[in-house]
Amino acid sequence: MNEKKLMNRAADNIRILAASMVEKANSGHPGGAMGGADFVNVLFSEFLVYDPENPRWEGRDRFFLDPGHMSPMLYSTLALTGKFTMEELAQFRQWGSPTPGHPEVDIMRGIENTSGPLGQGHTFAVGAAIAAKFLKARLGHVMDQTIYAYISDGGIQEEISQGAGRLAGHLGLDNFIMFYDSNDIQLSTATDAVTNEDVAKKYEAWHWKVITIDGNDPDAIRTALTEAKAVTGQPTLIIGKTIMGKGARKADDSSYERNCATHGAPLGGDAYINTIKNLGGDPTNPFQIFPEVKELYAKRAEELKKIVAEKYAAKAEWTKANPELAAKLELWFSGKAPKVNWNVIEQKAGDATRSASAKVLGVLATEVENMIVSSADLSNSDKTDGFLKKTHAFTKDDFTGAFLQAGVSELTMACCCLGMALHGGVIAACATFFVFSDYMKPAIRMAALMELPVKFIWTHDAFRVGEDGPTHEPVEQEAQIRLMEKLKNHKGHNSMLVLRPADAEETTVAWKLAMENTSTPTALIFSRQNIANLPAGNDYSQAAKGAYIVAGSDENPDVILVASGSEVSTLEAGAELLRKDGIKIRIVSAPSEGLFRSQSKEYQNSIIPTGAKVFGLTAGLPVNLEGLVGANGKVFGLESFGFSAPYKVLDEKLGFTAQNVYNQVKEMLA
């Protein structure tokens, strides 16, 4: 046990560095970072188990920061562990700096997650805890680890905390400990201006162990963490009552603590100088680590060497006794695409693509041992039950299955899947109706930003949902998701792969592409209704190029018809009428424009030549295909919300028929 005086000195060191980072950048959030310094100091100097020499060690504890605006606290603490230099701290929020305003995942530097909008970070941690339980059920003690999360008042207020709290408690995630930095201050008001809820009772109702402490007392923090580590059968919430801007002084040297002004702005001028002096630092040279604090963290580094050596020795014995499991561990954490015998999948002609997806999922359930699939209370409708029937759902104390029943909580489910991917060792997929992807957009964006290969399964892909009416009929959703194919990630690649297959066989290819995509998230968009298969003799492997010819390979067609999903079969029906008039037709299925645009210009021009007359049909907004049809093209799409009626009636009323394809193309060619 470290002396309280030393622990307070180390926490003050973090406060000085955090306040100075914000001051130098003239931008940032010092108050929360100063208040939370005591907890992260105790955690990193006494509890968190990791290998400083091997940051990617799969058996490490993981720390997820929810309030990304408190990044100065995390960077400063990691600097004490040797992961950041003082110069890098001083470059906070600057171009090219490794210390951006909100943390971005960087395992080598100890940053486990990109901290997105409040509420997501701790939900990532719930997903990581689920992944750890799943892996421990298969691999044993080598995955015996603790997942820590840090949440603020704002994160508690975000609606997603309801889903994360409920799910973690329901599953009894006793490998999960969350610190709630309860300082009663947020950006524009005190928390009592917006809430009077009893947070402790709320989490207790979700079956959490709740411990309330003075969050600035290192002895109380240590005791709480020790108690939490011993808890079984439930996650633990440590409510730390902290002081916003702890140690901060105003220009007149009066207290600047518990003040909203310190939340999101530099302390400034004399207030900053007085604060650094009050904390025992040098305002003229604030970027330094005190000698005794260096010694504290050097001591922890030596402790970690011994702890990790014991862990590695135990792993070596386990590997010797379990060579097959050891090989699986290595493969699963490699991030490589799994081997799947795609040839065993037998699709039924004319099936809905959601049903075709179920057949694929049934094979994946048996062939991909580290895959976890989740559904937001729709498994029998989104057809993820094809996977569930080959395994069973997680329950408290039983993670031998591979299915997460997330309940009606789409954003929570998505963020949990991101957390699973961040943990590593598992392949995560989640499903709901396409219209409910609206609830998932924040997580989709974060998956793209972090380059996480999560598989998003969205069924009931268009107005053909039918009788449920416009609230459940996606129209604009496809355009929104396809924008992610146009948005580049920081590696310069399409930030997402979006696939909407045209029939059952193309669905198998889409799933193959999704499973082989290990560098970005994938969207799989499937139909509710049955779809006629593409013309006989089609080479489905060409779907891997994003767009390909499925009928009419004439070198000089009079018109090219383009669509994705179920509209391709409508084009084929319309083409039969057009051919009777002697019109030469080429039909192109385009499951992914992003993938198509990544092909060579030569290939693109061979499918849709520059200047060709192109007609596009989409059950979404016309913009879905405008990039493919070009200046000489025309798109018939849906430009309004849908209606409640049987889907075949809607096809007729909205113009998604062979006859209207014929009429539209004839008008275009006139």
Locate the predicted segments by residue:
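Non-catalytic, alpha-helical, charged scaffold/linker segments
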Residues: 276-307
